[in-house]
Amino acid sequence: ALTRITASLEGAPASSSAKELAARVEAALHEGDTLMGVTPEAVGIAVRRALGAALSWDDIDFEVIHGPVVDPMINVAMDETLVEDVAAGRRKPFMRLWEWNGPQVVIGSFQSYQNEIQQGGVERYGITVSRRVTGGGAMFMEPGNCITYSLVIPTALVEGMSFEQAYPYLDQWVMEVLDKLGIKARYVPLNDIASEAGKIGGAAQKRWASGYMVHHVTMAYDIDAIKMNEVLRIGMEKIRDKGTRSAVKRVDPMRSQTGLPREEILQAFFDHFKEKYNASVGTITEEDLRVARERCETKFARPEWVHRIP
């Protein structure tokens, strides 16, 4: 079988995708052939990597960034503006831990504002509502109640992978951190992270034609569930399903399962990524913030973006 597989790949165009290469391998297999510890897809990805068309983690010169503390919408804008900087070569690929100074709800790119948001709760608590560039569900975020990070990378790192494969691949380092913290976590397809005690968080992605992407994750640290249910419509629906409004007062998987302050968990994330990928420590500059504020004015804060019909 190995001889046939090798022959099937010889003469293939260098521009062949991992999927196309996998199809060649599949076609070369005879009935009864068994590949031990490898799949046709894995062979395709390996060939692409050997050609320099697909990347490994070790190929990327990363930065790791914490913060800064910014107005709620700035983080959302930077998920777009900083990707542009990386694609233009002005910044290295990076992992950035978010910090924010006010309450916010961040809805997914394809969600309906009206279907997700209870306007009365938003006004009552002075909450900023933002629409991010990635898909996924609504995130209720007050200062200190969540752990959120953005990973900006070349899409070549997940060349040939399906979305279902890419999510756990990009968050394998997170699973290692959670294990160190005493949480036995796993990925629940497509994009949820859960432990034996239930869901911890979720991930979302956006890929650009520039060849770069943002992958971000939000994990609940200690959320006021009562307030969340007054702000998010889906929260009200879940409470009604349970038949009670007082059943759950807090959603706190990261706090209750680790027993650690949020700051220690963030430091564990920061240190593990830095050490695992030999990342240098990066910063967000005043120019980065200026560009993000401008993008808020021209896009992210505008009603036609926040309230757009997907």
Predicted stretch roles:
Residues 41-120, 124, 132, 235-238, ...:
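Active-site loop/lid in soluble adenylation, ligation, and acyl-transfer enzymes
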Residues 13, 70, 103, 113, ...:
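Residues that cap or initiate secondary-structure elements
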Residues 127:
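Active-site-adjacent structural elements in enzyme catalytic domains
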Residues 1-56, 254:
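Active-site- and interface-proximal helix/loop "cap" or "latch" segments in soluble metabolic
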Residues 1-2, 7, 110, 118-119, ...:
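Catalytic beta-strand/loop module used to bind and position nucleotide/cofactor moieties
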